[in-house]
Amino acid sequence: MQPPIRENMLRERTVRLQYGSRVEAVYVLGTQLWTDVYSAAPAGAKTFSLKHSEGVKVEVVRDGEAEEVVTNGKQRWALSPSSTLRLSMAQASTEASSDKVTVNYYEEEGSAPIDQAGLFLTAIEISLDVDADRDGEVEKNNPKKASWTWGPEGQGAILLVNCDRDTPWLPKEDCSDEKVYSKQDLQDMSQMILRTKGPDRLPAGYEIVLYISMSDSDKVGVFYVENPFFGQRYIHILGRQKLYHVVKYTGGSAELLFFVEGLCFPDESFSGLVSIHVSLLEYMAEGIPLTPIFTDTVMFRIAPWIMTPNILPPVSVFVCCMKDNYLFLKEVKNLVEKTNCELKVCFQYMNRGDRWIQDEIEFGYIEAPHKGFPVVLDSPRDGNLKDFPIKQLLGPDFGYVTREPLFETVTSLDSFGNLEVSPPVTVNGKEYPLGRILIGSSFPLSGGRRMTKVVRDFLQAQQVQAPVELYSDWLTVGHVDEFMTFIPIPGKKEFRLLMASTSACYQLFREKQKAGHGEAVMFKGLGGMSSKRITINKILSNESLTQENQYFQRCLDWNRDILKRELALTEKDIIDLPALFKMDENHQARAFFPNMVNMIVLDKDLGIPKPFGPQVEEECCLETHVRGLLEPLGLACTFIDDISAYHKFLGEVHCGTNVRRKPFTFKWWHMVP
């Protein structure tokens, strides 16, 4: 059997009558049947009369004018090419072919009919239903279920990619096979109900079929629960190789429950929309294809993967345990204890010597009206932490997704220190209630490094956090988290953008020099850094360092301008944190002292790389300066020593930690991208 090809909503259809015979037809409630009395008439017929059952509403339509027909059959109408009948019924039949319409044909003056045509009708109700109004419940026959619209008044059902693993002994995500092992797995799916009502059995030659298009078959899967009362079996009926499924008509009032899962996220070649159809098919004769006489369609949008900005409350902090980071680990633990989140340590057997947990993964989430759960995006970087997301994170209600390039080379810019997201912003009247994704790229026309296209396409295709490309290729490592971060302002809905600034550093050092602290020493008490005494005077008198940092400030300002434009920020939204960089052999920047902007943000508690700046009156003047900027906003600054375990390997606190946060309370389907 071929699945039906026509997918339009067949709400009106034509039935052909023939004088001297009776035609049987199935009528679906909510549709209209048209029949042409003129072409069905015998030769010599000039007028016709009508008789019909109480349950059928019959109208004679001539030249666009409709006239309702009483049941007694006394009235006559002149036959003309424009004479048609419009039939409808309001209730499902209790028996097959129990409702009738009879057309009697007459000659000019004759009182007895010369012939007649009969139509025997069976009325049934068919409705494929989903949660189109997004309240978590499947409603009945929502008129907008076949389309999908954004916004607070929007309609259309939502589907989750079933990318978690509810069965611990399976190697991959639940959506990777066609089996269901538990009720928990069904809870990740969206419900769909096929409602039918009618006589105990349909007339011979009719069947009901559920089907999907070939292009949707790798994006959606449908399951049916067999024997709900005698130990359930979950049968996979649609998706992958299965394009259609014949539904057994049970008679009376019936509701068949199906479970629908998403198989893949929106991407460059997939908008995220999938449709499922039910058709009533009519059989004519052996060897002739079945024809659809009624189709009902529902549409789902697959929920996008959503990133969580720093302003959202933290749930868990992840950090790697290394041979050399015991003190760092202890300081992070102390910081986390001040907040209400948990510390999760990735031990050496799992990290295999890879400390950069920020670079391997990005935490996000997916959500539908009935359910939501966190989903980790695995970077194509694939360092020694590459098994961590699948082995330690993927599990019940914790999903996994990745994008790997086939032919492109993976660079440092594909690490997820180079993937951040802003808090919610409004730009020129356009709202971004979930913020905007920020990724680092190369300078236009420079032919430098860029994040791989498959990841950029994936982020763009999610639609709800329109990405902004920044310029990060001027840095040796090339990550956006090396020059910017966002902090919440406690108790307010506001935030600030923190940016690394070499000019702020030079300005601070000149002020200290002017106040007589030119001999203040940096990196005090650190044996391994350098045998040279590095003072404010030495830094300010180093011409090449000054020139390099003027260039780096231009790179920072280029990004500042993009961020101001794309996030609608003003200067008062930005706080400059002093930073210094030195140029490597490729003319790219690496931090001269621990880069304070590369911090971990846990509500009001900030874990900031300890800069080991010049000691003025027994205090680091950089720490004092930063406290003076941030503490008046209600933030608490904790400076963490990362110099030997992270800074010397070209990363800081943010690079070595990762935070899973609570999802937005705002529902993504309420926005208009």
Curated annotation (Swiss-Prot):
Record EC number: 3.5.3.15
Cofactor annotation comment: Binding of Ca(2+) triggers a conformation change that is essential for catalytic activity.
Localization per Swiss-Prot or TrEMBL: Cytoplasm
Active site: 655
Gene Ontology terms for molecular function: calcium ion binding; histone H3R26 arginine deiminase activity; nuclear estrogen receptor binding; protein homodimerization activity; protein-arginine deiminase activity
Residues reported in the UniProt entry to bind Ca(2+) 4: 174, 177, 179
Enzyme class label: hydrolase
The entry's keywords: Acetylation, Calcium, Citrullination, Cytoplasm, Hydrolase, Metal-binding
Modified residues (N-acetylmethionine): 1
The keyword Metal-binding appears for this protein: yes
Family: Belongs to the protein arginine deiminase family.
Biological role: Catalyzes the deimination of arginine residues of proteins.
Listed name of the protein: Protein-arginine deiminase type-2
Native source species: Mus musculus
Gene: Padi2
